Structures are given as C-alpha cells and as structure tokens.
Amino acid sequence: MMRKSQLQFNTELRVHHPPALFRSNKIICTIGPSSQSVEVLKDLMKAGLNVARMNFSHGTYEYHQKTIDNVRKAASELGIHVGIALDTKGPEIRTGLFPAGDVVIEAHKTVILTTDETFKEKGTAEKFYVDYMNITKVVPVGGHIFVDDGLLDLIVVKISGKDIECVAQNTHTISNRKGINLPNADVDLPAVSEKDLMDLQFGAKNRVDFVFASFIRNADQVNEVRQAFGGKIAVIAKIENYQGIDNIDAIIDAADGIMVARGDLGVEIPAEKVVIAQKMIMSKCNKVGKTVICATQMLDSMTHGPRPTRAEVSDVAKSVLDGADCVMLSGETAKGKYPVETVVYMSRICCETQVTMWNMAAFEAIKNLQSFPLIPEEAICSSAVNSIFELHAKAILVLTNTGRSAHMVSKYRPPVPIICASQELDVCRLLSITRGTIPVYYDTEKLGPDYDREKRVGLAIDVGKQMGVFKEGDVVVAVHADHHTKGFANQIRAIYIK
C-alpha cells in the first residue's frame, strides 16, 4: 500500500522495530574536567562523539592546549576523524564586583544599575555596576533586565544619566560578574572582544576545525569573526537573541552553519517561543543545506544522574525530527558524573528517532523548495539521493577533496550512510558535523595518486564492508568526477557489491 502522508507512515511504526543501525546525527561534546583525559575521550569517541567542543568562557590556554592534544591523540589511536570546535566567550554583559560576596536582591525593592566605574568593585544590594556603557540608551522604561541567566528579573522604572532605577520582581542572590540579558534591546556590542581575538589567534595556531561564534546578531558579525581568525575556518553562528532571529536569513547565508543556543535564547525570548524559533531556524537551514546544531540542556539531568528524564529524551528526539544535523552536550560531558553514559543515551535516542522519519517525504520537501535550474553538481547529488529510494541502495559513496559534494548529498537527507573518501585530513574533520557522513582518509602516499578513481571507490567499499554497512549482493550509489575532471562531481553510478 502506498503511503500518502506522514500520519499514515506513523501508524505503521512499531515499538519492537530495531533502531537505525547507523546514526545520521552527529554528536558534539563539551570537554572539561570529567572528560579531558585520553582514556575518557576514547570512550566518548567509541560511544559516539564526533566533535570536541572547548568552551572559552572558562579555562586557560594551557588547559585548552591539553584538550586539543588529548583529543588528537585519542582520535589517532582509534583511527577516526574527530573535529575540534572553539566556542567563543562572545560580547557578554556582566555585573561588577560585590565586596560582600553574595548579595540578596529582595522582591519589590528598588535597585540601581550604573555604568559609573566608581562602583565597578563596590556593588551592593542597592546599587551595582554593569559593564555595558550604552545600556542606558537601549533599555526603555518598563523594559526587563535579566540577571544571572534570568533568575533575577528587574523592571526599569527610571533612567537618569548613568543610572537605571529598577524594581526587583523576585528575590534572588547574586555575586560577582553575573551575566545580564536585555530582551528586545538593540545591543551594539562588537562581535569580537579583545579576549575573543586572542582566543581566535590561539585557535588558528592550533588549526581548530570550527569556531562557534557566540551572540551573533547580524551577518557582518559572522564576517568579523572569520577575519579575526585570520585564515580559512568554518564559522557556526550561535543564535541567542532577538536580533539574531530577526536577521536569521542573512546570518544563514554568511555562516557555515547555525547553532540554536537555547540557553541565552530562552532568557532573551520567552521560553515557550524557543520552540517556534528552533523549528523555524532548523527548517530554514535544511532548505538551503546549512548545518544546524541544537544545544543546551538536552540531557541535563545526566550531569548528576545515570539516566535521562523522559522529557529530555523527547527533547532530543524532537530536535532530530525538527531537522538538527547535530545535537550538543554541554555540562553533561564537561563536568558531569556520567559523560560516557550520556553519549551512549544520546546516540541511542537519535537511532531510535531515525526510524520514525519518512525519508522520502523529507527528500521531496527539500527538493521542491529549490530554485531551478540547479547547478550541475547539486543536480547530480540530489539525483544520487533519489536513486537510493529507487534502487534500495545501502549507501552513497562520495569522492571529495573539498567536502562540497558530500555536503550537497547530505542536504537531501538520504536514509543511508554517506561514505566520503578524501585525500585531505582537514576535510575528513570538517565532515564531522555533516549529517550522515562517514569520512575516510585516502592516503596518497600509501594508495597512489588521488586521480586513481577506482582505488578511491574501492577504499570506500572496503570500509563499508568492514563496518557492516553493506555486503555482497547489495547495491551502492557512487558520486564522483570523471577521470579528467577534478573538484566537480559530474557522475553517478550504481555498483553491485562483490
């Protein structure tokens, strides 16, 4: 019987059906005290880690250098390709210092925020410093100011000179250097702070694979981050505020990918609106084939407990169904008690969710939204995915030196692994965030020149057999250039596995 709708497809699901054998979604893990050792990193990689994230809001350069060295050592010992991401601190707004340490702000009491630097280290419950000089120009009377991840809600009642008089809406204890969010405010902070610039230079020196750029508000800021890095780099723009949402189309166009950073975003906009923002942003990224990451509190309870809540399982599954290419873990793997178990659960949830997806409908939806005519390379790649359904093929083999063809194939959401043979190690690591890909390094010194197409196809087939992706008698689809064309995929063919 022909399936006519997603609803029809859903009615045919069965709980006892096995999960997907190969996980399409990539897993990003934040590395911290719980996960920095080589042995734990190897366990994380075996469990499903694809990208190691360093949070530059914390830690010294010595600490991050150790993380980079350990990740590369662990990946090398396992013979796999793992990406490394530098997550910038970004242009944050923070309070000053409080000599008394913890200070209680009581509900319904008046508190003054000031940009007067004489209060920089003299904060009290009645008046404390804020390090954003233009705050008096961008917040209106009646507007909200959130302190400490939204745990303290202040309403502005009066603005005078450098002072903003507010009334606390709840009681909360704050301390030194707490973050401040200004919902709906047109904040004009630069994309790259002095600290960010030094951090990016450190990243360039160590040849990190990705920069996760915090608090991106417009496309120009994406370019600022790229220029500050000083070399070729994949920039993932983190959407964390209203301005980022309002400018999302231009940001998607400028960036190499998008992260829906639900932590700060859920403070800047109402939490229930994050559901809409997530679905909208992911759909826009899917339409144009840009990588999209879902982050924050995905399996947060596993920071302290061995199993996720049912709500967290549903959240991860919903993110996959919404179109996330990658799902990200933060404190769960950085400081949690169960980092490896968390990745195991994350991988299992993704594999179970994959079998609920009607892949043909996803392919047709994306293809129908494209502007025709397509460029030849994309037409070849989309046709390769279409042939998967017609041939019941078990995999797509892509020969790529830049990752471009692999990414185009991934855009059309094939339900099978994409085995990508490349002579460039950098490309193998870049593919660590591309949905469905299995990067394979073609070592020209051992295997001969990269233009020997059949050797490269043979390598991809050997890897697929070893991994159990396909077996003798199965069909696979290959995408590559002809013998005389380099850097341009212009051929597809069906191959019977012998």
UniProtKB/Swiss-Prot annotation:
Cofactor entry: Mg(2+); K(+)
Binding site for K(+): N55, S57, D87, T88
Pathway assigned in UniProt: Carbohydrate degradation; glycolysis; pyruvate from D-glyceraldehyde 3-phosphate: step 5/5
Binding-site residues for ATP, renumbered to this chain: N55, F56, S57, H58, R94, K178
Binding positions for Mg(2+) per the UniProt entry: E240, D264
Protein EC: 2.7.1.40
Catalytic activity annotation: pyruvate + ATP = phosphoenolpyruvate + ADP + H(+)
SUPFAM superfamilies documented for this protein: Phosphoenolpyruvate/pyruvate domain, PK beta-barrel domain-like, PK C-terminal domain-like
Family: Belongs to the pyruvate kinase family.
Protein name (Swiss-Prot/TrEMBL): Pyruvate kinase
Originating species: Trypanoplasma borreli
